[in-house]
């Protein structure tokens, strides 16, 4: 059973977060291992396995990038374990420039202002790519969606680096 079906949701990129959370809580209550403490060992083990599946499914569907990766896996794309080489040199050059810019921000006297502006631009890039990806999923252009997911992974990693730098600047 796929994760969407587990939560009674349609297989779509856009997910109602509130509905996902409420169904997650209901399934957690239903399959919580403590409810099976007095049951035979086989039932207890099945409950533990089901609880783990529910948790994994929720984590995959809750995060937009993980959800996209999971949806692609349903269509035969394993973007987590592939050795795919990014062929979009313009995108790769842009990533190098963004990383250099982020590295330079920490040395600036107005680092907090510069980082805020950088984070805003990065967020706009992520929103734009997510919009493209949404269209690609809706149109079932899986190869294009996989390419967009690969690009979003670069941006997601850059977003994590922005958050790390924000923490460093707060500690100064």
UniProtKB/Swiss-Prot annotation:
Give the SUPFAM superfamilies listed for this entry: Chaperone J-domain (SSF46565), HSC20 (HSCB), C-terminal oligomerisation domain (SSF47144)
Q: State the function annotated in the UniProt record.
A: Co-chaperone involved in the maturation of iron-sulfur cluster-containing proteins. Seems to help targeting proteins to be folded toward HscA.
GO biological process: any one?
protein complex oligomerization
Primary gene name: hscB
User: One Gene Ontology cellular component annotation?
Assistant: iron-sulfur cluster transfer complex
Ranges of residues in domain J: 2-74
Q: Which UniProt keywords apply?
A: Chaperone
Q: Does the keyword Calcium apply?
A: no
User: Which Gene Ontology MF annotations are present?
Assistant: ATPase activator activity; protein-folding chaperone binding
User: According to its UniProt record, which protein family does this protein belong to?
Assistant: Belongs to the HscB family.
Q: Name one Pfam family in it.
A: HSCB_C
Q: In terms of domain of life, where is this protein from?
A: Bacteria
Q: Does the entry feature the keyword DNA repair, yes or no? A: no
Q: Which InterPro entries match?
A: DnaJ_domain, HscB, HscB_C_sf, HscB_oligo_C, J_dom_sf
This chain belongs to the protein called Co-chaperone protein HscB
> What does the subunit section of this Swiss-Prot or TrEMBL entry state?
Interacts with HscA and stimulates its ATPase activity. Interacts with IscU.
